[in-house]
């Protein structure tokens, strides 16, 4: 290179830059069988538009295993999704609120259940209110109740408690039940009913939604992955879909806290009978 630069009376750095520009740039890496994965990934992304590449990886691998094909790692799925413009926008929100360093998650199923309520707004102004009970280990929705244009009553919560106990236990013996301080949970009748079922009622501190973080996280997931991507013209339409949403969450939703397994898969792995659909 020095001899050429001296003969042409130019700087070596200039020649290096010329050579670098003439060199063919390396294209994006592709494996020969990426084309076999692309239709599967595209279908899953179309079906689950709110899922990122890790959850898409979990769903894709379930289907690959069923058909006897080797699984794909998340880096490969990420690369294929990036090359085809299927990645979600990066989350830029900042978490606000006080630090919560308590521990809500437990080491096995049926040690603690969490419960909360939320509402869904329909396009015509109807409101659908829901309450649910979720296991703090396997994240399965054990019982739920929904009502249109009315509030969740104490009797509905008590029915939900009984359904949860009957679903998980042959005998009446149940775990801690962690809720917020809503009146339907703190009512004397509800607390007495919980005690009769051998539930141990626990309530979060005032102004500390993080203490019921499993329930809060589920509400966020449910609204993002189901409510906001489906048509909700009125309460009747919403009520018709809710049962299917809960069933799909229990059977299919990959959860990062369960090593990307669904709640149903986690129950089966732990030799625990899941709630029937």
Question: What residue spans do the PLM features occupy?
Answer:
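Short alpha-helical "recognition helix" segments of helix-turn-helix
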Residues: 2-7, 56
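RNase H-like polynucleotidyl transferase catalytic core
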Residues: 4, 93-95, 146, 174-181, ...
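Generic alpha-helical secondary structure signal
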Residues: 10-14, 36, 156, 189, ...
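Basic, flexible linker segments flanking DNA-binding modules
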Residues: 13-112, 262-273
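Conserved, non-catalytic sequence blocks in retroelement Pol enzymes and Pol-derived host proteins
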Residues: 31, 50, 66-68, 105-107, ...
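Mobile-element integrase/transposase regions
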Residues: 75-134, 140, 156-174, 277
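A short acidic/small-residue loop/turn micro-motif
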Residues: 135-136, 146-153
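C-terminal domain-tail junction helix/linker
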Residues: 173, 195-197, 221-277
């Amino acid at each position: 290179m020095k001899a050429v630069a001296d003969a042409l009376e130019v700087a070596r750095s200039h020649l290096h830059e010329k050579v670098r520009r003439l060199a063919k740039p390396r294209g994006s890496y592709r494996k020969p069988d990426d084309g076999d994965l692309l239709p599967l990934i595209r279908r899953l992304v179309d079906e689950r538009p709110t899922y990122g590449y890790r959850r898409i990886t979990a769903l894709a691998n379930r289907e690959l295993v069923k058909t006897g094909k080797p699984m794909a790692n998340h880096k490969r799925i990420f690369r294929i999704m990036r090359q085809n413009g299927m990645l979600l926008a990066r989350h830029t929100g900042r978490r606000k609120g006080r630090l919560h360093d308590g521990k809500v998650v437990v080491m096995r199923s049926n040690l603690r259940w969490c419960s909360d309520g939320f509402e869904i707004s329909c396009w015509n102004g109807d409101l659908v209110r829901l309450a649910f009970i979720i296991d703090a280990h396997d994240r399965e929705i054990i019982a739920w109740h929904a009502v249109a244009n009315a509030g969740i009553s104490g009797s509905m919560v008590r029915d939900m408690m009984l359904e949860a106990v009957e679903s998980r236990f042959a005998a009446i013996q149940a775990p801690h039940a962690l809720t917020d301080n809503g009146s339907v949970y703190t009512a004397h009748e509800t607390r007495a009913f919980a005690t009769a079922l051998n539930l141990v009622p626990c309530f979060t501190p005032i102004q500390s939604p993080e203490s019921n973080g499993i329930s809060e996280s589920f509400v966020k997931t449910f609204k993002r992955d189901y409510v906001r991507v489906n048509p909700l013209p009125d309460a009747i339409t919403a009520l018709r879909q809710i049962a299917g949403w809960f069933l799909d969450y229990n059977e299919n939703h990959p959860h990062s806290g369960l090593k990307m397994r669904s709640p149903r898969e986690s129950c089966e792995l732990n030799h625990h009978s899941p709630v029937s659909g």
